[in-house]
Amino acid sequence: TAYEIKECEWSSDVCSSDLGPDFQNLHRNKRSITLNLKTKEGVAALKRMVKKADVVVENYRPDVKRRLGIDYKDLAKINKKIVYASISGFGQTGPYADRPGFDQIAQGMGGLMSITGLPGQGPVRAGIAIADLTAGLFAALGILTALLEREKSGKGQHIATSLLQAQIFMLDFQSARWLIGRSEEHMSELQSHSFISYAVFC
């Protein structure tokens, strides 16, 4: 089928709900619809919603959304005021643009794993999906800025961020030390290379 609508029974007693904690955390205050965008009917249903929408957020690879006919250029023809936010693994252009992304891959490629943990331990990932969360925050900031700008121009725009971009941003101190002093970062016995008295004390 092209699309499916399911009603979730939300309860004020979240602890006894049949919906798991992750589902409740991520989907509270949302209305959901599942679309099969590999069908003409599914794409048509999406485009009907876009006519009245303010924002579209998507995390398809660039080649996939172009193939489906739902990239920014396609949807802006339907609604010129649409703010279209893309969150991808490696950005909309470049040699890795059409590769799928995953939080742990971004942590590794962005350099975070190489400075997390203790010396001799090997690369360690952060305990949370930090690249996912940071990229989402960047997208939210971009959306809000685009909506504010739209109040003046009357036009929407395409904003984009990526897991890798967000992860590299998180290593701003390390990047500055390398660019200016060619100082290479290493795992650091729970101490900071930037600040005095920034460590774990017992």
Predicted regions and their residues:
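Acidic, glycine-rich segments within the central catalytic cores of soluble metabolic enzymes
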Residues: 17, 109-188, 192-197
